[in-house]
Amino acid sequence: KYREANFGRFPKGLMYGLQMYDSWLYDDEKPFIHIKTNEIFRQLREEIDNGYFEKLIKEYLIDNNHKSIVVMKPKKGLQKIKDQEEADKLKAYKDSLSEEEVKKLVEETKQLKASQEEASTKEELEKIPVIDIEDIRKDVKPLSNVESELGGVKVLWHQYFTNKIAYVKLAFDMSHVPMDLVPYASFLAEILTIVDTTHYSYQELGNEISIETGGISATMDVMPTDVHEFLPMFILKTKCFYSNIEKAFELLKEVAFESKLDHKKRLKEIIGQIYTNLKITLTETGHKSAANRAMSYFSEYAAYREAIQGITMYETVKKWYEDFDEEYDNIVNGLKEAARMIFEKQNMTISYTGKEEAPEFMKAEVESFIEGLYEDQKQGKKVKVTCTKSNEGFATAGGVQYVACAGNFKDAGLEYTGALKVLQMIFSYEYLWIQIRVKGGAYGCMCSFSDQGDSMFVTYRDPNLAESYKVYDKAADYVADFDADDRDMKKYIIGTIGSMDMPMEAVDM
């Protein structure tokens, strides 16, 4: 973490400067003590075998008397009780008001709505400083993608400074894996590194991964490539110091080829965890689920995503969880068949990011990994996804909704242009924001237009339904009547570039 210094969208220089103030404000001669910490790490390493950390754990955790135990128990129907209590409270308050006081509240509400709909004056808006478009760099930084080969497998080398960290991704093309196995492939990505292997319990494996690497994970990703075209990938990735690359690949082999996919008790535990997490995801980030579900009616890309992480996957996991004993054999067979079809040499591409060492430094490790892959089989046709227009609604226990609608403008004969990125900014921070958020509607509202044509509107934590759809319906009228002066258009364009032109970390290459 220290060497990576990954601050997300914020520039490193800015974040280092803020860190310096933690000491610099109090000692003019020590601006760098919170940045130069290699010496501290060296001292901590020397204490590993001296009982230092065990002493800290015993003193501040095990023998610490300052603790509390909190038990949270669910109560069926609690939300209905709270809703009724609130309704009774509001009714009692209204009954306590005189007729004049009620009229006053109604009038104040009307005034509030009027103020929400009232636009700021031009003079007020021009008090806000705006940079010039000429201040924005127009050239795009070129990406470093040097193609080579190791062990007969294509390697993409991204030459960026990584502070002696190697970032390795082993990507496997899943285009030939049939749709009935896709949920099992998604589940496979979830369980790798958290099930027992031939040589480790899953707890020991987790410790070994943490000691020797910056993490090992498996993910499924799907990338749109053209209108109604996509590329599904199964990715094993790790990051480690150059000096630990041999151990990192040993662990990658252990995870990919030695994982026990038939441990019944452990599989049931993991399925329960995934089921719970998916339920939480559907309620806390339901706007993403709603938007992708709506796009899945016409987009093969979105329909595939549904099968691996959306409502469709939730329904699959729910069945596994509720009928586990009956489904167990199917789950194990599905996992093993998915792994066999994925882990073939002909599917594999390696992505490596690092500058101090060329890819050849891990040649022996890559070749050893390739030896463990399944023998290449004749592949079937590229997977096809069937889209079904359903127009659905899903009930949850929450008191708010996530309202989405979607379509594809390329299917209507229109082409993508960069102006749609600016329109997305205008919609999100002007039209949708004012018509929905400011006027007491959803807590959030957003839209997107992809270069494949997929488009959507969606709200976040929305108390309304029909009202939000009416706003969506009038979006075209808003664009037809849209007018803005040079200053406003400059703000929209600058805001659009600001959302795109962010630091990209080596780990993201």
Whereabouts are the PLM-identified features?
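Short alpha-helical segments and helix-capping/turn motifs at coil-helix boundaries
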Residues: E39, N50-E59, G152-V155, F172-M174, ...
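A diffuse structural propensity rather than consistent per-protein peaks
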Residues: D49, P129-D132, S201, H263, ...
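His/Glu-based metal-binding/catalytic segments typifying zinc-dependent metallopeptidases
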Residues: F10-K30, H34, S96-A189, T193, ...
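Long, compositionally biased intrinsically disordered regions
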Residues: I35, R42, K55-P142, K279, ...
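M16 family metallopeptidases and their MPP-like homologs
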Residues: K1-R45, N65-K75, N163-T193, T197-D325, ...
